[in-house]
Swiss-Prot record:
This is Chitin synthase 4. InterPro entries: Chitin_synth, CHS4-like_dom, Nucleotide-diphossugar_trans. Residues 19-28, 188-199 have a biased composition (Basic residues). The gene is chs-4. Residues 1-212, 266-514, 1087-1092, 1138-1235 are cytoplasmic. The chain crosses the membrane at residues 213-233, 245-265, 515-535, 1066-1086, 1093-1113, 1117-1137.
Length: 1235
């Protein structure tokens, strides 16, 4: 955050850092330069640095730590002073926090919000310590003085009160600053309006994106008027349809590419390989000539000596019709390649009978006889019938062989054949040469070089050096190369067993894909086991109200999930129960009446030395441990939200002449008292948690069991509060009362009578007139009911708040008034937390929420660190909340987590039965694997937990997580005009929130905690399942498209979460094609032989590993049966549901998932705009301004504050009911409480 820091090294922050100036520079007033972001303000203390808007396009940016810099590092690049061609200074390597950032930067909105917070610089460079401040001057820069008489003697030694004059001066300076901001804002508003008018005047349409051009090209065959005829008259509907067709075309292309790689790539690059016959396996129907096999079974030789004509008049077949059978023999010497490369090397011997011409061409080199293919034939120099018999030297005979016959196969040698010691073989340029054939030379007929003899004789050194090897590289000299090329023509007997480049590439692609898929599958399995056996245990609480025997606990959970209304095996007992005063049966006033401190109690709570070293930091433990720092200082040096809520000046007094009754008016007498900060019933410091329940159309039984399960969790009631947000006044299908009325009946001890609660305005996540919405805030405590199954002695007092979105008066007559969607319900809380943390302007609704939480808990809302999000039809196991908070507290880097969701209606129908194992695998395989890297991509909205803020760096420093402005800003996006945004924000808002968290904080963790369990009912009708999975699949695709672009996730290249996300995205898109290919491979493997082993092995691994996971993780054996049911339903999961979801890309409704009374189906969802938004209907002020107005009104009705104080007695007449815990009793004068 934009806060002063302690000197020395500190861990890196996600937020921008503030660098201190030197003391001399700090003592000088900053220059009045708008570019630097500073400007002196009238009436402002020199120690207070206030930022003013810049004239640049970034009106609110971080100020430069150096006043001499030319401009703000966040401001856009200015135009050159001399546009005459002088080159501008290029970007250089600078600090990350000084980089220029755009709106796409993950921390853009956070830096803007942090830049608006006041910063009090330290004169020493250290955090301000209160004892030092007591003796210091008001002006930390040393330009002013302070009167000790201004400090009240009755105030605690940590407090410092300003005089009345200082308060007036502070208010004047604040008014002056507000006037300046208003003037600057107006100025900027005029600029924006002028530029907007200029754009409208130009009349230019926005340039269509490449995506829109592509979608238009794909759907050119369907013009707009045709779509109007098919029920799509609006441009938004037509655009969504065209984008859907564009996405489907891309999906088909990806499917085609996967199919091509699987089946077609080998056929294209390798083709059908020619027939190849291994040496010594050439059949009797072939003869070998120069390394190629010829099928001569149907050939006929012209009549010749020794080859008579057959009775049918045809020539004899040399394979079968002759006395000597030549089938399977090598006849290379019958058609010798002469007078080529060997000319000049092999010459005629004197007195030779070999015919020749004047050019030295010879008729043959070897005797014209055949030899065996295995090399066992001895040289045969006999000549039957006549000289040149069977040498085929005539042109007719040569043409008949070379032109008339086609080789049927290539004869190949493996390297084992080549290295066979019984043969004398070498390889040259891929051809196998038989050196033993050189023995067939008739020395009386021809002459040849002595080198021939050296190479053919096995006992020579030359032969031993090359036999059985490839001599291509060795025979590169001109003489040796000529000899090798000669051998290639006359003694070639075959070729090496090699493949073409295409076939090699095909195998490379096949095996790389195989290794990649196997690596991913096995890595997911192994790492999921490692998480289950080792990592997950570090997250769990050491002890809870349930059994510590893991096997017994698993059995109890399985029994508990058999029925949605079944009670847990054991209700919370002594372990985890709150301190005295938390039970409904105890006195409501005991905690406020009995003293909790004596004169011997330390003013700072528990001594720091009593705390165990290395304990995690929480809001409660931090404020108790800070002996020197102000207990209320949460964000350091006046930037804490609570103190800024209650004082307009960081060092000013909490009172002013206009003060009236304190915040919230009073604190409920039945508030659960806060235990000591060192009380750790579960072995870790407790953290305050908001249990958010979003309700829509649930019935009484569903809501009752949900709230019962949350109220009866063993986590202390002092540190949890139930917040129910009803999404409109909705009556569920078949219900007598609306959901808000049902939930209101589950509350008691209201702070304000329900009939007196008024609706308050807020800015909803919608467009048009729906952006203005109204809601009512009901606060009190949870009522278990008169007929509750929970024993009275077990019922604990749990504070509860309900926010009912009732809508504006204009929509009171509509079917679903106030309904804005679940995302809007979540934004109500997230925006409220952000404004509490940053002390920003809030709506009337948020102001009432602030006061309501104060009334029923006795603590400020900024004490809450964690939010549990639960749907109103989800039931939580008693110790689940404890396990989840344990993980959050033990590891501050965890920003979100989820538990396991189990199905309570397993046997309702075949539809629910096929989902059991799918839920199991998604948690214990997918989420467990992702948890190893801290990157769970989907935290289910029905049961998950997020961190509101996290401790960072030195003590009293916190950074917003869920309350981060970037998360809130993107999640509250109301301009949903593209198919991508609609699938993200209207259908899968829960998953998109997980994506936003990972995108904003890629270095933090989102994990799965298997010890936390909930149960819910799943669709038991196929059409409802179809509608639900349509939303989930489409949301998954679009969220993975967002997440695959995040480059800062864990890992690098193939060993990264980004790569895994990309694999998941492609796998989701090709699911229909994958299941079709699987069936094809299985059928082909059954029909044809041999079967395709590799695809079958992959299929067995993918389907079989989850079964092994069930066994080794000691889960119920019943999941084996559920697995077989799941395997039988694979066509539904992988073909029917994805295909339907793809075709319904442009359907943004929730379909049949949750029915309401009188609801009509609509494809638009909550994104449909109606009317225009009137912002004047919504009042936004800072909390202090709201509280000042309320106190003025209270003073008007109740009389002056002095009369009230004199009637009660003491310096603080409102302190008789101060809440105990977290040392609030000692610094309660920070709050204007009149409890």
């Amino acid at each position: 955050m934009s806060l002063p820091r302690r000197p020395g090294p500190s861990p890196p922050h996600e937020e921008p850092r503030r660098y201190r100036q030197s003391g001399s520079r700090r003592s000088r007033p900053p220059p009045a330069d708008v570019e630097t972001g500073y400007a002196p303000m009238a009436g402002e203390r020199p120690s207070q640095q206030q930022r003013v808007p810049s004239i640049s396009s970034f009106p609110e940016t971080l100020p430069s730590p150096n006043p001499n810099v030319e401009r703000d590092p966040l401001a856009p690049t200015p135009e050159p002073a001399h546009p005459s061609g002088i080159p501008q200074r290029k970007r250089s390597l600078i600090r990350p926090e000084r980089n220029r950032i755009g709106k796409d930067h993950p921390n853009y909105h956070y830096r803007k919000h942090a830049a608006n917070m006041n910063t009090l610089p330290s004169s020493t460079g250290h955090d301000p310590i209160y004892e030092d401040l007591e003796g210091a001057t008001d002006d930390v820069s040393g330009t002013g003085s302070r009167n000790d008489d201004d400090v009240s003697e009755e105030s605690p030694p940590r407090r410092k009160h300003s005089t009345k004059m200082q308060v007036i001066e502070t208010e004047k300076s604040g008014d002056e600053r507000r006037r300046r901001r208003k003037s600057d804002t107006t100025k900027h508003g005029k600029i924006v309006k002028a530029s907007k008018g200029k754009r409208e005047k130009s009349g230019g349409l926005p340039t269509p994106s490449f995506w829109n051009i592509y979608c238009g090209f794909v759907t050119f065959w369907c013009p707009g008027f045709v779509l109007k005829c098919f029920g799509m008259p609006e441009m938004a509907q037509q655009r969504a349809w065209r984008e859907k067709m564009g996405l489907i075309s891309i999906i088909l292309l990806i499917m085609g590419f996967v199919g091509f790689i699987t089946f077609g790539f080998t056929q294209v690059v390798c083709g059908k390989p020619p027939l190849r016959l291994r040496i010594n396996e050439v059949g009797s129907g072939y003869m070998i000539f120069h390394g190629s096999a010829y099928d001569l079974t149907k050939s006929h030789h012209p009549p010749a000596e020794g080859i008579p004509r057959r009775p049918d008049g045809l020539g004899a077949n040399v394979i079968y019709d002759l006395p000597q059978h030549y089938g399977g023999q090598d006849g290379s010497f019958l058609f010798q390649n002469v007078n080529g490369k060997c000319k000049g090397l092999i010459t005629k011997q004197e007195n030779s009978d070999v015919p020749s011409d004047k050019s030295g061409n010879l008729a043959w080199y070897f005797p014209c006889n055949t030899f065996n293919q295995d090399g066992s034939s001895k040289p045969n120099t006999t000549i039957p019938y006549y000289l040149g018999y069977a040498c085929h030297t005539t042109a007719n005979a040569r043409d008949s062989f070379y032109l008339g016959l086609k080789s049927s196969a290539d004869v190949y040698f493996t390297w084992d054949d080549i290295k066979n010691s019984s043969r004398n073989l070498v390889v040259y340029s891929g051809h196998v040469l038989d050196l033993d054939l050189l023995h067939w030379f008739n020395d009386t007929q021809v002459t040849y070089p002595a080198r021939f003899k050296e190479l053919r004789d096995k006992n020579t050194a030359g032969n031993q050096a090359i036999r059985g090897r490839d001599i291509t590289h060795a025979f590169q000299s001109s003489k040796d190369k000529q000899i090798a090329e000669c051998f290639e023509e006359i003694i070639k007997v075959g070729s090496v067993d090699t493949e073409t480049v295409g076939c090699i590439a095909s195998k490379v692609v096949l095996y790389v894909s195989l290794v990649l898929i196997l690596a991913v599958v096995l890595a997911r399995f192994v790492l999921a086991l490692i998480f289950q056996w080792f990592i997950s245990k570090t997250y769990a609480a050491a002890k809870t109200s349930q059994t510590s025997d893991q096997r017994k606990r698993n059995r109890q959970i399985e029994d508990w999930t058999e029925d949605i209304y079944r009670a847990p095996p054991r209700l919370p007992g002594e372990v985890g129960s709150s301190v005295a005063g938390s039970s409904d049966r105890q006195s409501k006033r005991s905690s406020a009446f009995l003293p909790t401190h004596s004169r011997f109690s330390t003013v700072y709570g528990n001594e720091r030395g009593n705390r165990k070293p290395g304990l995690p930091t929480t809001m409660a433990s931090q404020n108790a441990a800070g002996q020197l720092l102000h207990p209320g200082t949460i964000y350091g040096q006046g930037n804490e939200s609570r103190s800024s809520f209650l004082k307009s000046d960081a060092y000013g007094s909490s009172s002013s002449p206009a003060d009236g009754p304190g915040p919230a008016g009073f604190i409920h007498e039945a508030v659960v008292p806060q235990p000591p900060s060192d009380w750790m019933p579960f072995g870790f410091p407790l953290a305050h948690t908001i249990c958010l329940v979003t309700a829509y159309s649930e019935g009484e039984m569903g809501v009752r069991t949900t709230l019962d399960s949350i109220a009866m969790t063993d986590y202390p009631n002092s540190h949890k509060v139930i917040l129910v947000i009803c999404d409109g006044i909705i009556k569920g299908h078949g219900e007598e009362h609306s959901t808000p009325d049902i939930i209101l009946g589950m509350m008691k001890d209201h702070t304000i009578h329900p009939d007196d609660v008024e609706p308050f305005s807020y800015v909803a996540v919608a467009t048009g007139s729906k952006r203005h919405n109204m809601a009512k805030v009901y606060t009190g405590f949870y009522d278990y009911g008169t007929n509750s199954a929970i024993p009275l002695e077990k019922q604990q007092r749990v504070p509860m708040m309900m926010v009912v979105k009732c809508g504006t008066p204009a929509e009171a007559s509509k079917s679903k008034p106030g309904n804005r969607g679940k995302r809007d319900s979540q934004i109500i809380l997230m925006s409220f937390l952000q404004k509490v943390m940053f002390d920003e302007r809030m709506t009337e609704l948020e102001y009432e929420m602030f006061n309501g939480l104060w009334k029923i808990t006795g603590i400020s809302p900024d004490f809450y660190e964690i939010v549990l999000m639960v749907d109103a039809d989800t039931k939580v196991f008693p110790d689940s909340l404890t396990h989840m908070i344990s993980a959050m507290v033990k590891d501050p880097e965890i920003m979100g987590l989820c538990g396991e969701t189990k199905i309570a209606n397993k046997r309702a129908s075949w539809v629910s039965a096929i989902q059991v194992f799918e839920y199991f695998v998604s948690h214990h395989l997918a989420k467990a694997f992702e948890s190893v890297f801290g990157g769970v991509t989907c935290l289910p909205g029905c049961f998950c937990m997020y961190r509101i803020k996290a401790p960072k760096g030195a003590q009293n420093y916190w950074v917003p997580i869920l309350a981060n402005p970037d998360v809130v800003e993107h999640y509250s996006e109301n301009v949903v005009d593209t198919l991508h945004k609609k699938n993200l924000l209207l259908l899968g808002e829960d998953r998109y929130l997980s994506t936003l968290m990972l995108r904003t904080f890629p270095k933090r963790k989102q994990v799965f905690v298997p010890q936390a369990v909930c149960k819910t009912t799943v669709p038991d009708e196929f059409m409802v399942l179809l509608s639900q999975r349509r939303r989930w699949i489409n949301s998954t695709i679009h969220n993975l498209m967002e997440l695959v672009l995040v480059r800062d996730l864990c890992g690098t290249f193939c060993f990264s979460m980004q790569f895994i996300v990309g694999i998941e995205l492609i796998g989701t898109l090709v699911l229909p094609a994958a299941i079709a290919f699987t069936f094809y491979v299985v059928i082909i493997s059954i029909i044809n032989s041999p079967p395709q082993i590799i695809p079958l092995v992959l299929l067995g691994l993918i389907l079989g590993l989850p079964a092994i996971l069930v066994v080794v993780t000691a889960h119920s054996w019943s999941y084996i049966i559920w697995m077989f049911i799941y395997l039988l339903s694979l066509p539904v999961w992988n073909f029917v549901l994805p295909t339907y979801a793809f075709w319904k890309f442009d359907d943004f409704s929730w379909g049949d998932t949750r029915k309401t009374a009188g609801e009509k189906s609509s494809k638009g969802g909550h994104g449909e705009a109606e009317g225009e938004f009137d912002s004047s209907m919504i009042t936004m002020k800072r909390w202090a301004e709201f509280e000042r107005d309320r106190r003025v009104r209270s003073t008007y009705w109740a009389g002056s504050r002095d009369n009230v104080i004199s009637g009660v007695g003491g310096s603080n007449g409102w302190g008789s009911s101060q809440p105990r815990g977290h040392e609030q009793g000692r610094h309660f004068d920070d709050y204007f409480s009149d409890a």
